[in-house]
Structures are given as structure tokens and as C-alpha cells.
């Protein structure tokens, strides 16, 4: 097959002029064009890869910065903002008189806030409220005013706060009660509504928690033997002021402002760090100082430093010998002649010849005849 191709080529171009001046330049031109196209394609692929890599890095940096800003605000909100309220049921207890089957003592209860050391936040003001659900019975309507007292005690049962407040049911005239009863009678019949009033009694308006003596127990007492009630609950509500008030009442606005501020400061720190790390001169100097410090602690380096100091001493001795030789000869010597005249020979024991012995040696005349 190869022989046949060669014969065909020889028959078409016996002198090789076509191959030399037509085919070979065309093939070379084609290869050159192919190489250029391929190099440009590789460059484009490289630029596309670099562009994708840069975009990926920028996207990662943006996501990381936004996540850090959100995380910082969430962590600050979790640490700075306390729980808005704590609710505990109050189970009243009293002693019953055997003759009349009525309470002989005031209803009282012990409420355990927490088994831990602390429930409330130090420095935050709280409102302590006792809610009493009282039916609109004739006995409660005739009861009038009564007192509700509460004691705040710490883990060691030490008294940390005591307060009493008066309360009563809200007055409604017989006509208003009759009209409301007729209007709401379907709800009363279906059981969707009951005839009772919730009487809130604010025991403490601004109670402040102590760091050394946190409150763990509350003792509640209603100073009335004729009172009738369904349930009693204890509410401890945080009274926010200042920044906490803004963060609680306008959470979206405060979150936007705080996250934007965090983004600004994080971007400033990021740009300063980028500018600082882009200049590698200080890093190179630190590496050199660290290398010098680590090498100075190595015994081999210490030995080399000691040997260099000895070499410096030898140079000083040689220089002094040059000056001595110049003084003895009385003529001005060049540095080369002085180096030739200074003969510092070491014996096998490592001793030097003294300068006096060197002065006794015959010196050659270095002055030129004029």
C-alpha cells in the first residue's frame, strides 16, 4: 500500500516541486492555524475557569459575611433579650371549719419558679401579677375589697421581697348584667362562655433581680375567707425599656438595622485584612525574624557564631601586626606587602607566634628606587 502511494505521488510529481512548494507550506499553514485556534480556545477555557472560580469565591465570601452578620445579631438577641413572661399555676390551700364547712384560714400557696439557681435576668425590671378568675356569684358580689400578698424568697428561703395589693371585682349594675345575660345567653347555654371576671392584681410594678440572691420561690396569700374563685395564676412579665423595648416592639426594623451595621463593620474589617495580607513585605520580614530566632537557638549556629567571632579577633590581631611591622620598617607599606609580611603560623598545638618574634624576622625592602 505504501509503495502504491509512493508510485502515485511520484507519477503526479516526479521532481517533488509540488510537495516542496505547495503541499508542505499548506500543511504547515494548517498546523499553525490549528495551533493558534487551540491556544485561543485554551486561553478562553482558562479565563472562563478563572472567572467561574472568582465568582464562586465572591459568592462564598458574600454568603459568609451575611451569615456572620445574622449570626452575630441572633447571638446578641439571645444573650441580651430575656424571656418576655413566666407563667405558673397557683394551687391555693386552706383549712376548713368543721361546723360551717367554710374556710377557716386565708387561701395560700407556694409557687416554685425554678429548680435551678436563677430564672430572671439580673438588672431587668419585672411585673409580678396574680390573676384570679372569680365567678359573678352573689357571695363575690357582696365580698367587696380584699388583699392579695406575695413574698419573694431565694434558694435559701430568705425573704427578698414582700408586697400586698388590694383588689375587687368590677362593678356592674343589675340592668347591665341582665342585658349582657340575655345577649350572651346562647353562648352560655352552649358552654362557649362563662359568667366570671378575671381580676388582675399587680403585686410588684418593677421588681429587680439580685445577682447574689436570685428568686426561686413565691408565696401567695389571699386575705379573705369568703372569696370564691376558679383558678389563680402567677405571671411574671418583663417591663422592657430602652433598646430592649425597641427590639421587642419593632423586631423587623431592629433586625434590619442591626444586621446592616454588622455587615458594614465586617466589610470594613474584611477589606482592611485583605489590604494588609496582600502586602507580603511584613510577612516576609516576620518570617526572616522567626528564622533568625530559631537558628540562634541551635547549637551549630551558636558554634558558627563563636567561630566567626574568633575570625574577627584574628583579623584584628593581623591588622595590629601590620601596623607594628610598618612601625619597625619605618617605610610606608601597602596592604598587599603587609599581608605578605604578617606571618601567623600555627603549630600543631594551635599556638601563634608572638608579635616580638615577628618583628625580629628579616623584612624585605619595599621602597622603590626613584
UniProtKB/Swiss-Prot annotation:
Membrane topology (Lumenal): 77-251
Expression by tissue: Widely expressed, with highest levels detected in fat body, moderate levels detected in salivary gland, midgut and muscle, and weak expression detected in brain.
GO molecular function annotations of the record: channel activator activity
Main localisation: endoplasmic reticulum
Membrane-related topology note: Multi-pass membrane protein
Gene Ontology cellular-component annotations: endoplasmic reticulum; endoplasmic reticulum membrane; lipid droplet
Keywords for this protein: Endoplasmic reticulum, Lipid degradation, Lipid droplet, Lipid metabolism, Membrane, Signal, Transmembrane, Transmembrane helix
Signal peptide: 1-18
GO terms (BP aspect): diacylglycerol metabolic process; intracellular calcium ion homeostasis; lipid catabolic process; lipid droplet formation; lipid droplet organization; lipid storage; phosphatidic acid metabolic process; positive regulation of axon extension involved in regeneration
Composition skew (Basic and acidic residues), residue ranges: 350-359
Record-annotated membrane-spanning stretches: 56-76, 252-272
Localization per Swiss-Prot or TrEMBL: Endoplasmic reticulum membrane; Lipid droplet
Region (Disordered), start-end ranges: 346-370
Disruption phenotype: Flies are viable and fertile with no noticeable behavior defects, but display reduced average weight. The size of the lipid droplets in larval fat bodies and the fat cells of young adults is significantly reduced, but exhibit ectopic lipid droplets in salivary gland and gut. Flies also display greatly reduced total glyceride levels and hypersensitivity to starvation.
Segments in the Cytoplasmic topological domain: 19-55, 273-370
InterPro entries on file: Seipin (IPR009617)
PANTHER family: BERNARDINELLI-SEIP CONGENITAL LIPODYSTROPHY 2 HOMOLOG BSCL2 PROTEIN, SEIPIN
Biological role: Acts as a tissue-autonomous lipid modulator, preventing ectopic lipid accumulation in salivary gland (a non-adipose tissue) and in promoting lipid storage in fat tissue. Required for the growth and maturation of small nascent lipid droplets (LDs) into larger mature LDs.
UniProt name for this protein: Seipin
